[in-house]
């Protein structure tokens, strides 16, 4: 409870940064023994977003949108999205892929704003999952 009270005092940008840290740690741990979602190499992985987190904040913390990705594909190949998309469909299935894409399209029409309580919920969820 004390943690939640301390989190409520933080700004949205500070909460988002904390949430990103815990979420990315979860993704790296979840996918640590798997190959890069784009190129298939077994190497140190980062949390690579299929739909850009900056352009599509609604799916920033969506586990179907973020997978282990090598630094080369994530940074130097801008996500290496063509093989990422096919491997993503293979991994999560067409239905979940379509749902993810629909969420992005819908948010572009309706807009999306961060909420302190939503971010605190994400922080608490992924902090617990990382224990």
Regions found by a protein language model. Give the residues of each.
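A boundary/linker detector
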Residues: 1-22, 100-101, 106-131
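Short Cys/His-rich Zn2+-coordinating modules
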Residues: 16-25, 50-56
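Short cysteine-rich loop/turn motifs with clustered Cys
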Residues: 20-46, 70
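Short, solvent-exposed positions on alpha-helices
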Residues: 34-37, 79, 98
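Histidine-centered nuclease catalytic patch
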Residues: 37-66
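Short Cys/His-centered divalent metal-binding micro-motifs
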Residues: 44, 66-92
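A contiguous, mid-protein "functional segment" used to position or interact
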Residues: 83-108
């Amino acid at each position: 409870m004390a943690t939640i009270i301390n989190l409520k005092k933080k700004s949205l940008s500070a909460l988002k940064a904390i949430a990103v840290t815990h979420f990315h740690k979860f993704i790296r741990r979840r996918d640590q023994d798997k190959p890069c979602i784009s190129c298939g190499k077994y190497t140190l992985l980062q949390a690579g977003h299929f739909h850009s987190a900056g352009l599509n904040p609604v799916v920033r913390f969506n586990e179907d949108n973020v997978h282990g990705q090598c630094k080369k594909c994530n940074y130097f190949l801008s996500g290496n999205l063509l093989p990422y998309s096919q491997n993503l469909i293979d991994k999560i299935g067409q239905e979940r892929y379509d749902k993810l894409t629909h969420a992005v399209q819908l948010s572009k029409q309706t807009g999306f704003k961060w909420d302190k309580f939503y971010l605190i919920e994400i922080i608490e969820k992924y902090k617990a999952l990382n224990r």
